[in-house]
Amino acid sequence: QHTETPITMARTCLESTTGASSSRANPGFLLAAPDAAETAGEVCGFNLLYSGSHYLSVQKSLQGLTRVMHGISPANFNWELAPGERFETPEAVMAWSDAGFGGITDCFGRYVNEALIPPYWKNRPRPIVYNSWEGCMFDFTEAKLLRLGKLAKQLGCELFVLDDGWFGKRDSDTSSLGDYSVNAKKLPNGLKGLGEKLNAMGLQFGLWFEPESVSPDSALYRQHP
């Protein structure tokens, strides 16, 4: 939702300390001239090429200048460098447009397509995706997934994504997140067997991960509490 806040000498901060960004705490913001509109007016946009905990602040100085800080969240963060070592921070990007909010959106869109998207996907239509989550959530077998794959192909889908539940003892959202070994009870032929059968239907095969999270009830957490 579009929210506007005046820039004053009081610092305005946006941050995430949860290890994630996403739509809950996007590390992006705009600085807009008072007369900026959708198609006219000066707008500066900022974003961070990083999906972890982040911090940004905007403040007007005593001289009337706008100061922006943007980067990794300092909360609970430290990194010791030995002599000769280096630490590379996430890249912060800034864009400017005199064509309003629509102009800055287009500017960032061009940047993402030209500089961030893998070369194979530049200016290429994305495949139509079927995701297994709404169809079966954690309750599936290989046979059920293949039935869904057949229906997805009939609907014109091109990529079948197997969502949560394929690993560990993941029968609910209370355990196993982080234990990315195949659940042989659900997938006796493994991911390779399922993928080959979906490929034979003419579907690409994709897989869901949530690498930024871990369940307390998991082997990974017990090994690294």
What is the predicted function of each stretch?
Residues 121-225:
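Aromatic-lined carbohydrate-binding/catalytic grooves of carbohydrate-active enzymes
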Residues 1-112:
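N-terminal accessory beta-strand-rich subdomains and adjacent acidic, glycine-rich linkers
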Residues 108-123, 128:
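Long, charged amphipathic helices and adjacent flexible linkers at domain junctions
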